[in-house]
């Protein structure tokens, strides 16, 4: 235990003592549960539930529940939770973040807190970054839960609402952050409560929590419908930008911002034949020019995006993966399409949106696990109220982290990287090289090809076999080049992964992909008849697995002798956490390994945020292209630059959250109103209250200093909802405002009661629900757009010495108030004027069930959009108005 003393500060050590006492209790229970028969062990779930029903808390039964899970895992998986894995489980149960190094078995760690919290019957969500991991983790860990009588579901792309509801109704559900978030939005667009699939947000464990809650924090999930704006301005702006020279615009690389200079503005005014392009009347044109500028000056092909099959596909800056189905917002995507000469797609209209920050903060309890979180603890505490506990490793970490090598230029740096690869390759040491972009990975690949080094390249262009390539990166002599953290979630096992090798061999032997994917899942209860091929494949799998297991164990010894996995970073990322993730691929479970970063002074981080002192040192030394430099000041400057960027990015995310919180509060109010309507609450009193309020406001409006404007008031009420000639009140001019309000309200209620008698009581209540839902949805969609436009222009308030956030809150509140007024007026107007000839049906503003999800992955600087709704521009609007969509909700 002495090495732990060096790893943890006093606070951590104090807490670790407490955790160890709890784990001692869990360990002491092991003999008791070991001696139980399977049936007795299975019955523990019923016993625990009974104890909870009798007043005990889940904290009370934690030691026993954890001990039960450990014993079941031994029996069904052959895996026994280490003490440190039990500590990790306790941290997760407490609603905190467990930082556990790569290879420490985070998937298994989650099983104990998942089971414990699932005993409440309120559901547990396990969140992963992609469908592959969600399904893999569900299939592997379901054996434990199902043994204990728990149902386990998985939410993946493409499932229909019926299947999704079944998965959410399980005790435990695995899925991706995107699928959970989009289902939440869709549940708040349905028009019957039975169409909702989620059953509440109780407890979530987020795997790779830093990726989801930090890297993707600013990513809004958006469900959208087709817009109505023309695309010609994108082409015009693109053609104009091609005429500009560098002096016509100013680039702020640090902030990734670009704007026209005075000469650029003058050229734009001449080109588009306008007097003052910055005038409010030319806002849209100026916006298109700015987006075209961004597309040409800031957005780089094969770094930020790729052009594939006639479309622009975003590249995730953190993983290097292609983000199919994702589009940049605010016209940037269209500007890039124009730049690349592709067909320009129309901008869409937002129907519903939420950020990951606000979605995950809705869970009653939230926890997470990752290999790298401590550097972002301040942000986790500030935004999510979660602290980070560094769980000790099961075995002592012996990886050698070598000092950075700094070179004057990129050419010198990459030549040095290639030379180190050659030297390590001579002894067959496996090497994983991390690059920051597709462009850089292909540059290094070309250098290695010229030097005759066989290697694998894993980037957004070659992502098909990502998991397999990463899993085999620990084989003898393997050289793998990967962009950033591609393959995250897949362990690199020294000597190779026998499971992947077995499945590859089976594919070569002619087994179909669907069969290969099922060979290692439970087959208990599956009849032999009709599944002969599966049983044959299972036998083949077990035979081949043993063969490859022996082979990889032999190879592992050779890899260890060669020094383990060598990690080479070709550039420092702007976040220390991303660098630590790359380092963390080596040295798992006490394996040997090494890591080193190579840095060029012209790397983005050094060029934009590095200290001027570095340039001074280099100039004094007279550094050659291929001469490395090591200096204490350099190391401090690099770390200082990273801290500077991390602080800046945290500030941006915090600032964005201030704005998003305004919209979030409004969303909560609207969704709560929808929920009330959906769940069948009698709206009669609310409709009466709305009617009274409208009349009262109108009376106030037409009662001024000169007295009551009777004619103006009547005309206003007839235009709103009352039949012409219905307001006949003797000597109305002698009544005070309160009396007028009550008299007109009596008239309105008689008319409404008469309509209700014609329609029938129950039917009228359903009509009220239908009308109110449609009014809420239609106005909410327009309000989202209006708030978005307000937010885009609010920054200018700073010029007038007004805090933009405060201005946004105040004006947003006024707009929300105005929206509620319109909802009220529309609801009452439609109800008083509706003629019911056919049975009333609830119709959604958009066909939620037919929305298709994009594939996994998101990008923080883009809006994540669900596309391919079935509502066309010229289709009848689904709200039931009888108008075309483009002239109604699609306006």
From Swiss-Prot:
Gene Ontology biological process terms, A to Z: intracellular protein transmembrane transport; protein import; protein targeting; protein transport by the Sec complex
UniProtKB keywords: ATP-binding, Cell membrane, Cytoplasm, Membrane, Metal-binding, Nucleotide-binding, Protein transport, Translocase, Translocation, Transport, Zinc
InterPro entries: Helicase_ATP-bd, P-loop_NTPase, SEC_C_motif, SecA, SecA_CS, SecA_DEAD, SecA_motor_DEAD, SecA_preprotein_X-link_dom
Molecular function terms, GO-annotated: ATP binding; metal ion binding; protein-exporting ATPase activity
Catalytic activities: ATP + H2O + cellular proteinSide 1 = ADP + phosphate + cellular proteinSide 2
Listed EC numbers: 7.4.2.8
Cofactor note: May bind 1 zinc ion per subunit.
Family annotation (SMART domains): SecA_DEAD, SecA_PP_bind
Topology of the protein relative to the lipid bilayer: Peripheral membrane protein
rRNA-binding found in the keyword field: no
Positions with a binding annotation for ATP: 85, 103-107, 491
Subcellular location: Cell membrane; Cytoplasm
Pfam families: P-loop_SecA, SEC-C, SecA_DEAD, SecA_PP_bind, SecA_SW
Obligatory cofactor(s): Zn(2+)
UniProt: Zn(2+) binding residues: 877, 879, 888-889
Single GO cellular component term: plasma membrane
Family under the similarity heading: Belongs to the SecA family.
Reported function: Part of the Sec protein translocase complex. Interacts with the SecYEG preprotein conducting channel. Has a central role in coupling the hydrolysis of ATP to the transfer of proteins into and across the cell membrane, serving as an ATP-driven molecular motor driving the stepwise translocation of polypeptide chains across the membrane.
NCBIfam families from the UniProt entry: PRK12904.1, secA
Subunit comment: Monomer and homodimer. Part of the essential Sec protein translocation apparatus which comprises SecA, SecYEG and auxiliary proteins SecDF. Other proteins may also be involved.
Protein name, as recorded: Protein translocase subunit SecA 1
Encoding gene, per UniProt annotation: secA1
């Amino acid at each position: 235990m002495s090495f732990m003393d060096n790893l943890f500060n006093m606070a951590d050590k104090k807490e670790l003592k407490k955790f160890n006492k709890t784990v001692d209790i869990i360990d002491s229970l092991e003999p008791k549960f070991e001696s139980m028969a399977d049936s007795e062990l299975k019955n523990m779930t019923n016993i625990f539930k009974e104890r909870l029903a009798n007043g005990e808390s889940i904290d009370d039964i934690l030691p026993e529940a954890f001990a039960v899970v450990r014993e079941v895992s031994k029996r069904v998986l052959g895996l026994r939770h280490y003490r440190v894995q039990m500590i990790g489980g306790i941290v997760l149960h407490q609603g905190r973040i467990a930082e556990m190094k790569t290879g420490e078995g985070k998937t298994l760690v989650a099983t104990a807190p998942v089971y414990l919290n699932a005993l409440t019957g309120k559901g547990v969500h396990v969140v992963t970054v992609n469908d592959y991991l969600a399904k893999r983790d569900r299939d592997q860990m379901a054996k434990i839960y199902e043994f204990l009588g728990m149902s386990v579901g998985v939410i993946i792309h493409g499932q229909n609402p019926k299947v999704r509801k079944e998965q959410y109704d399980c005790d435990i559900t695995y899925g991706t952050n995107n699928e959970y978030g989009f289902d939440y939005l869709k549940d708040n667009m349905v028009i019957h409560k039975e169409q909702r699939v989620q059953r509440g947000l109780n407890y979530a464990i987020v795997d790779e929590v830093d990726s989801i809650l930090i890297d993707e924090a600013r990513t809004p999930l958006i469900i959208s419908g087709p817009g109505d704006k023309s695309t010609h301005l994108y082409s015009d702006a693109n053609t104009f930008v091609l005429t500009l020279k560098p002096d016509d615009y100013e680039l702020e690389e640090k902030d990734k911002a670009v704007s026209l200079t005075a000469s650029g503005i003058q050229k734009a005014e001449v080109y588009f034949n306008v007097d003052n392009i910055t005038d409010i009347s030319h806002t849209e044109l100026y916006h298109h020019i700015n987006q075209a500028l961004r597309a040409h000056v800031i957005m780089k092909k094969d770094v930020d995006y790729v052009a594939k099959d006639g479309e622009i596909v975003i590249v995730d800056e953190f993983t290097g993966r292609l983000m199919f189905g994702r589009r940049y917002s605010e016209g940037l995507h269209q500007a890039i399409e124009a730049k690349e000469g592709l067909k320009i797609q129309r901008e869409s209209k937002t129907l519903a949106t939420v950020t990951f920050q606000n979605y995950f903060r809705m869970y009653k309890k939230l926890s997470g696990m990752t290999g790298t979180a401590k550097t972002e603890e301040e942000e986790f505490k500030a935004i999510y109220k979660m602290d980070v506990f560094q769980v000790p490793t099961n075995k002592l970490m012996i990886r050698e982290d070598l000092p950075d090598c700094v070179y004057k230029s990129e050419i010198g740096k990459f030549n040095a990287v290639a030379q180190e690869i050659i030297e390590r390759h001579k002894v067959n040491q496996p090497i994983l090289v991390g690059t920051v972009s597709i462009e850089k990975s292909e540059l290094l690949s070309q250098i290695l090809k010229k030097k005759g080094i066989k290697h694998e390249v894993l980037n957004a262009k070659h992502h098909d076999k990502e998991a397999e390539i990463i899993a085999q990166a620990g084989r003898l002599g393997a050289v793998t080049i990967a962009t950033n953290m591609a393959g995250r979630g897949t362990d690199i096992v020294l000597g190779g992964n026998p499971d992947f090798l077995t499945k590859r061999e089976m594919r070569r032997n002619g087994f179909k992909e669907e069969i290969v994917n099922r060979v290692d899942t439970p087959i208990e209860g599956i009849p032999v008849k009709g599944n002969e091929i599966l049983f044959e494949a299972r036998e083949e799998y077990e035979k081949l697995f043993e063969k490859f297991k022996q082979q990889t164990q032999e190879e592992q010894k050779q890899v260890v002798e060669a020094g383990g996995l060598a990690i080479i970073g070709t550039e420092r990322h702007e976040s220390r956490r991303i660098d630590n993730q790359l380092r963390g691929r080596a040295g798992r479970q006490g394996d040997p390994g090494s890591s080193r970063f190579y840095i060029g002074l012209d790397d983005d981080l050094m060029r934009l945020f590095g200290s001027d002192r570095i340039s001074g040192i280099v100039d004094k030394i007279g550094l050659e292209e291929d001469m490395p430099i090591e200096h204490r000041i350099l190391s401090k400057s690099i770390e200082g630059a990273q801290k500077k960027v991390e602080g800046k990015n945290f500030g941006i995310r915090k600032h964005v959250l201030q704005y998003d919180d305004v919209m979030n509060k409004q969303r909560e109010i609207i969704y709560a109103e929808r929920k009330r309507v959906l769940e069948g609450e009698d709206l009669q009193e609310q409709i009466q209250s709305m009617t009274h309020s409208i009349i009262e406001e109108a009376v106030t409006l037409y009662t001024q200093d000169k007295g009551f404007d009777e004619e103006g008031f009547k005309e206003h009420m007839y235009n709103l909802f009352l039949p012409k000639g219905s307001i006949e009140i003797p000597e109305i001019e002698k009544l005070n405002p309160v009396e007028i309000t009550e008299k007109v309200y009596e008239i309105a209620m008689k008319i409404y009661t008469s309509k209700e008698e014609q329609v029938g009581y129950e039917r009228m209540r359903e009509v009220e629900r239908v009308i109110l839902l449609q009014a809420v949805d239609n106005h909410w969609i327009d309000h989202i757009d209006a708030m978005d436009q307000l937010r885009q222009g609010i920054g200018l308030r700073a010029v007038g010495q007004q805090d933009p956030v405060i201005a946004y809150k105040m004006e947003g509140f006024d707009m929300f108030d105005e929206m509620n007024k319109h909802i009220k007026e529309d609801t009452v107007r439609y109800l008083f004027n509706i003629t019911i000839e056919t049975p009333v049906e609830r119709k959604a503003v958009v066909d939620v069930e037919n929305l298709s999800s994009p594939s996994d992955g998101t990008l923080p600087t883009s809006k994540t959009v669900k596309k391919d709704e079935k509502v066309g521009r010229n289709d009848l609007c689904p709200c039931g108005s009888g108008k075309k969509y483009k002239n109604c909700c699609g306006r």
